[in-house]
């Protein structure tokens, strides 16, 4: 199939391009209280727990809505109102964590580095030693605004040594970058259906340390986002408290089957790494410069400096590339002009090469010569 005949490929961090099998799974209607759907939900949660190695220590709590809904639910449920959160920031989604704490009226402090500088374990060591009031540390594992990968395992060890609790937004890493609950201590790790698992958007999920979840009754600011109540009701009835995203759950169930058939996390990581390597190499041939050095670049999404040519306008560039069958993502940095290209979804290295060819053609048509 030519690029002109197919739907545009989403080179974005989610929603992303899904397989035909995943889309076909949404063609069935489910009763939200039906036992078959309850079994589907239970199967999804069990398979998700297996990916993170949390079967003996953590509980998977699904929640309707975007990933941010689940992040807000995790903070609102697991952080008591007299707790204090240290928020680690090196991009837009770290800033969103701080905004959530502000809106929920949870005391918090922030530590912010440049957008191309990961937070270090030494930073966290110093910050926790200086402020004993901190009860929780919250961070983004892979900061989607750049693609930077923060050193989760090293930070988690520091947090544990200080007797604090860790909340991890793993939205753009879970399923493609290894996180083992048996080695990385955390109270909550949050992800969503429409990212590296290649499902469709509409459902978040929180891996909550079971003891912390049980102890959190009464913390939450919200009825709908109370993870402790959601889990208690599910454990008792097998059902969601409120109308579930039935088609999204069915699509994720099918996407997980394909994930397992592909070879699980190691195979998914290899494919995304190949996509990323291909993208970086082909874009370099066109003259593009990536924003991050290779050692902190996650194989999820790559940020590129925009062309220096005065004829470059992102809106025109985006539209030309879209007409050739690929959808890119605008930049999300504050200091320099950039754009982003995702490496995830139901795509492989061949399609990454096609995408870069389309980018090159678009630049020539727009007479953008200085990259």
From Swiss-Prot:
Keyword Transferase included in the entry's annotation: yes
InterPro entries, sorted: Aminotrans_V_dom, NH2EtPonate_pyrv_transaminase, PyrdxlP-dep_Trfase, PyrdxlP-dep_Trfase_major, PyrdxlP-dep_Trfase_small, SP_NH2Trfase/AEP_transaminase
The organism's place on the tree of life at top rank: Bacteria
Enzyme class: transferase
Catalyzed reactions per annotation: (2-aminoethyl)phosphonate + pyruvate = phosphonoacetaldehyde + L-alanine
Molecular function, one GO term: 2-aminoethylphosphonate-pyruvate transaminase activity
Gene Ontology biological process terms, A to Z: organic phosphonate catabolic process
Modified residues (N6-(pyridoxal phosphate)lysine): 195
Entry cofactors: pyridoxal 5'-phosphate
Known EC number: 2.6.1.37
Function according to Swiss-Prot or TrEMBL: Involved in phosphonate degradation.
Entry similarity comment: Belongs to the class-V pyridoxal-phosphate-dependent aminotransferase family. PhnW subfamily.
HAMAP family membership: PhnW_aminotrans_5
Name of the protein in its database record: 2-aminoethylphosphonate--pyruvate transaminase
Source organism of the structure: Pseudomonas aeruginosa (strain UCBPP-PA14)
């Amino acid at each position: 199939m030519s690029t002109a005949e197919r739907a545009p490929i989403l080179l974005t961090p989610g929603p992303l391009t899904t397989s035909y099998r995943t889309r076909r799974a949404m063609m069935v209607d489910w009763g939200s209280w039906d036992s078959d759907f309850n079994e589907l939900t239970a199967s999804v949660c069990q398979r998700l727990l297996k990916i993170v190695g949390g079967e003996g220590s953590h509980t998977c709590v699904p929640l309707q809505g975007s990933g941010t809904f689940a992040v807000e639910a995790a903070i609102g449920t697991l952080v008591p109102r007299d707790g204090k959160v240290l928020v680690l920031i090196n991009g837009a989604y770290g800033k969103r964590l701080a905004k959530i704490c502000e809106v929920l009226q949870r005391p918090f402090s922030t530590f912010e580095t440049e957008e191309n500088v990961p937070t270090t374990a030494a930073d966290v060591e110093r910050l926790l030693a200086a402020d004993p009031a901190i009860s929780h540390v919250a961070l983004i594992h892979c900061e989607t605004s750049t693609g930077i990968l923060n050193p989760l395992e090293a930070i988690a060890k520091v947090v544990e040594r200080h007797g604090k609790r860790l909340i991890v937004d793993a939205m753009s890493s879970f399923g493609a970058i290894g996180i083992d609950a048996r080695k990385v201590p955390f109270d909550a790790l949050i992800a969503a259906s429409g990212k590296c698992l290649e499902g469709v958007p509409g459902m978040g999920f929180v891996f909550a340390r079971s003891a912390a979840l049980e102890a959190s009754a009464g913390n939450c600011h919200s009825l709908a986002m109370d993870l402790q109540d959601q889990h208690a009701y599910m454990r008792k009835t097998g059902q969601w408290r409120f109308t579930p995203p039935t088609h999204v759950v069915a699509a994720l169930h099918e996407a997980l089957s394909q994930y397992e058939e592909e070879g699980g996390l190691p195979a998914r990581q290899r494919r995304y790494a190949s996509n990323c390597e291909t993208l970086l190499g082909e874009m370099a041939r066109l003259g593009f410069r990536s924003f991050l050095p290779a050692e902190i670049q996650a194989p999820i999404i790559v940020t590129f400096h925009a062309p220096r040519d005065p004829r470059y306008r992102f809106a025109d560039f985006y539209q030309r590339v879209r007409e050739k069958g690929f959808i890119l993502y605008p930049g999300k940095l504050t200091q320099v002009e950039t754009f982003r290209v995702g490496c995830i979804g139901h795509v492989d290295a061949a399609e990454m090469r096609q995408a870069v060819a389309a980018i090159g053609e678009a630049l020539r048509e727009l007479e953008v010569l200085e990259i």
